[in-house]
């Protein structure tokens, strides 16, 4: 029986997102690296693999969209206690986090539905969103091509 309507994508540029296992990590500091998996310009969502070496401290931040985290390996100290390899956490829109510390070398999958806003006692210090993640990926590709 034929389909009652045309189900082809309305936009021909729609495609899957594929990141190979051997794609290089983007080093952000001596203790922190990321691998960009997916960025959605349409929704503002993004997904990354994050690797923190033992002792890395992520600054205080607020989630301006829900986020999912799944620890692949390692251990993190978070406001609610300790997350271990195999743990999953959902962080709702609006949640505040104090500093998060890598108690061991840690790798985790992070999927975010918006902006993460960083702050200290006095002011906002920065943010991460789909645009900053996309720029991070583009700059890494340019740097790799220049090598």
Enumerate the predicted regions with their spans.
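Conserved short histidine dyad/triad with adjacent acidic residue
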Residues: 29-62, 92-96
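Glycine- and acidic-residue-biased ligand/ion/polar-headgroup-sensing regions
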Residues: 54, 63-78
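A short, N-terminal "cap"/entry segment at the start of jelly-roll beta-barrel domains
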Residues: 1-44, 124-147
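Short, well-ordered beta-strand segments in beta-rich or mixed alpha/beta enzyme
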Residues: 49-52, 71-74, 99, 109-110
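Residues that flank catalytic or metal-binding motifs in active/ligand-binding sites
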Residues: 33, 67, 104
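Ligand-binding loop in jelly-roll beta-barrel domains
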Residues: 93-122
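Short acidic-glycine-tyrosine-enriched beta hairpin
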Residues: 77-101
């Amino acid at each position: 029986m034929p389909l009652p309507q045309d189900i082809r994508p309305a936009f021909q540029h729609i495609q899957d997102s594929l990141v190979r296992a051997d794609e290089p990590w983007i080093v952000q500091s001596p203790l922190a690296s990321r691998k960009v998996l997916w960025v959605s310009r349409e929704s503002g969502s993004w997904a990354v693999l994050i690797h923190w070496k033992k002792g890395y401290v992520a600054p205080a931040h607020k989630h301006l969209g829900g986020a999912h985290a799944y620890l692949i390996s390692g251990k993190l100290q978070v406001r609610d206690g300790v997350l271990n390899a195999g743990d999953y956490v959902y962080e709702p829109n609006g949640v505040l986090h104090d500093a998060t510390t890598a108690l061991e070398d840690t790798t985790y999958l992070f999927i975010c539905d918006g902006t993460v806003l960083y702050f200290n006692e006095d002011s906002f210090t920065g943010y991460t969103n789909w645009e900053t993640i996309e720029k991070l990926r583009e700059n890494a590709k340019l740097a790799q091509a220049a090598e």
